[in-house]
């Protein structure tokens, strides 16, 4: 199949999947353009704003991309009865949190990397979509070796923390009543 046919197929798939969205129906009626153009234009504008990073908006938009996509999949997983997708999503949130902590402490270095937030957004989308397996790949390559080396699986320590947290929550409940 030629690239032109692949592009047409992709656009028609977008049109089909968005047929029930009222705002896109209004766009189509008012402009005479397919719904897929609005979707692609919106994504294009989103990435241009990240790329330009005017007023620091790139950081916010990048973090929103890192929250919305896996957040949606996480909400679906919470409502499902299976646990097959839970490991992938838990792995994502561990990678996302680790990445944000490392990023916070390296802001001075990141200032010198051009288009950092664009690269970050692409990375977060890659690790955030469960079908790519990106979160598991990053976890296995970067976080797991560190955690195995420095974080001891101490069940007594975990139980002590859990008991302390329950004690605090019980105290708060007593104060509230």
Swiss-Prot record:
It comes from the Eukaryota. Residues 1-34, 77-87, 127-177 are cytoplasmic. The keyword Transcription regulation does not apply. It is a multi-pass membrane protein. Oligomer. The short lumenal loops between transmembrane domains 1 and 2 and between transmembrane domains 3 and 4 may impart a wedge-like configuration, thus deforming membranes. This is Protein YOP1. It comes from Debaryomyces hansenii (strain ATCC 36239 / CBS 767 / BCRC 21394 / JCM 1990 / NBRC 0083 / IGC 2968) (Yeast). The gene is YOP1.
């Amino acid at each position: 199949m030629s690239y032109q046919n692949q592009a047409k197929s992709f656009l028609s798939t977008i049109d089909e999947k968005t047929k029930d969205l009222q705002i896109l129906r209004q766009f189509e009626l008012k402009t005479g353009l397919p719904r897929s153009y609005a979707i692609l234009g919106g994504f294009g504008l989103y990435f241009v704003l990240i790329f330009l990073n005017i007023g620091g908006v790139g950081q916010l938009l990048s973090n929103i991309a890192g929250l919305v996509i896996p957040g949606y999949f996480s909400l679906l997983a919470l409502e499902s009865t299976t646990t097959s997708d839970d490991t992938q999503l838990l792995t994502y949130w561990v990678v996302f949190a680790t990445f944000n902590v490392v990023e916070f402490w390296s802001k001075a270095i990141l200032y010198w990397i051009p288009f950092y937030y664009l690269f970050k957004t692409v990375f977060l989308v890659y690790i955030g979509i469960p079908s790519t397996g990106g979160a598991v790949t990053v976890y296995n390559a970067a976080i797991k070796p560190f955690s195995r080396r420095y974080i001891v699986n101490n069940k007594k320590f975990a139980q002590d923390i859990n008991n302390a947290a329950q004690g605090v929550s019980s105290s708060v409940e007593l104060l509230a009543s």
